[in-house]
Amino acid sequence: MAGETTQLDLSVKAVGWGAADASGTLQPIKFYRRTPGERDVKIRVLYCGVCNFDMEMVRNKWGFTRYPYVFGHETAGEVIEVGSKVQKFKVGDKVGVGCMVGSCGKCFNCQNGMENYCPEPNMADGSVYREQQGEPSFGGCSNVMVVDEKFVLRWPENLPQDTGVPLLCAGIVVYSPMKYMGLDKPGKHIGVIGLGGLGSIAVKFIKAFGGKATVISTSKRKEKEAIEEHGADAFVVNTDTEKLQALAGTMDGVVDTTPGGRTPMSLMLNLLKFDGVVLLVGAPETLFELPVQPLILGRRKIIGSSTGGLKEYQETLDFAAQHNIVCDTEVIGIDYLSTAMERIKNLDVKYRFAIDIGNTLKYED
């Protein structure tokens, strides 16, 4: 029951990387995970993705980081132990863990496959388990995890874990809202604002859906990679008013992947057809102006979205495997982590980082 607490047996020795305080200084952190229960899966972590959100959480940008903090909400590995009542997995299976490791299981959202919108979620990193008397969860940037089998994902056989692990963040973040709004149908024309970690994978999904992808970016230098490397059909700089006007009323949807609200809402709404939709998956730090007239006259919509439920997580991995979709990923060792965080801060990454945990992070007494 929500609100009840029971002291857990914490016996699994673990080591992760994270921060002791808001200075953001990264360091090894030793801790204990719970003893695997009858429905738990014990996982040897092999890869952990790193993204902008991790950098912000390490430095307590949003004001709710709990220290010591071990980050990691996109994790891939292999099963090394299963509880007596686990049915989905066996030792040796390749698996993944996304941003959630628990939820209440009783609310409307949980009952309808939207566990990510549970009002009492247990996030993979930094959440406080209801049953653990205030002990925070520790993320996947560690050598081992213990997770309820419900929140463990089956890893497709033909999907590489090193370049596939960012799908547990960047992939689900764009897949979920596009599917929900029907933009996964062939023939849809979708604009993608920004060509970073989210935008690049959005383009790949759109093309696999059978749609048309137009990238809108602040940087002309990204045109070649958008079209030649990711398969975009068209590319427009967001200051090219002539080309943008020519695209007015042609798009079924626009996915804004940028965090800074750099593209005016009026511009995005102007690109939409009647009944079109703007999907906000970035997190603007400032308020933007909302032009109401284009919404009313075109019956257009603006929606926000945050990751996806467990079913959608699995669908994302399976769809990516079916269409040979992986993320453009730079695989690094744990000793490079501080440099990687600085590069993320300076927008110097193309397009995601994944830490080779299995070969570079070991527990030592």
From Swiss-Prot:
NADP(+) binds at residues 52, 195, 197-198, 217-219, 222, 262, 281, 283, 305, 307, 352. This is Geissoschizine synthase. Zn(2+) 2 binds at residues 104, 107, 110, 118. Homodimer. Mainly expressed in roots and, to a lower level, in leaves. Its cofactor is Zn(2+). Binds 2 Zn(2+) ions per subunit. Alcohol dehydrogenase involved in the biosynthesis of ajmaline-type monoterpenoid indole alkaloids (MIAs) natural products, important plant-derived pharmaceuticals used in the therapy of heart disorders. Catalyzes iminium reduction on 4,21-dehydrogeissoschizine to produce 19E-geissoschizine, precursor of vomilenine, an intermediate chemical in the biosynthesis of ajmaline. Zn(2+) 1 binds at residues 51, 73-74, 169. Pathway: Alkaloid biosynthesis; ajmaline biosynthesis. It catalyses: (19E)-geissoschizine + NADP(+) = 4,21-dehydrogeissoschizine + NADPH. Belongs to the zinc-containing alcohol dehydrogenase family. Class-III subfamily. The lineage of its organism: Eukaryota, Viridiplantae, Streptophyta, Embryophyta, Tracheophyta. The strictosidine aglycone-producing AJM7-DeltaHYS yeast strain expressing pathway genes of the VOM module, RsGS, SBE (GsSBE, RsSBE1 or RsSBE2), RsPNAE, RsVS and RsVH, accumulates vomilenine. Additionnal expression of pathway genes of the AJM module, RsVR, RsDHVR, AAE (RsAAE1 or RsAAE2) and RsNNMT, leads to the production of ajmaline. Ajmaline is an anti-arrhythmic alkaloid commercially used as an efficient drug for the treatment of arrhythmic heart disorder. Keywords: Alkaloid metabolism, Metal-binding, NADP, Oxidoreductase, Zinc. Its EC number is 1.3.1.36. The keyword S-adenosyl-L-methionine does not apply.
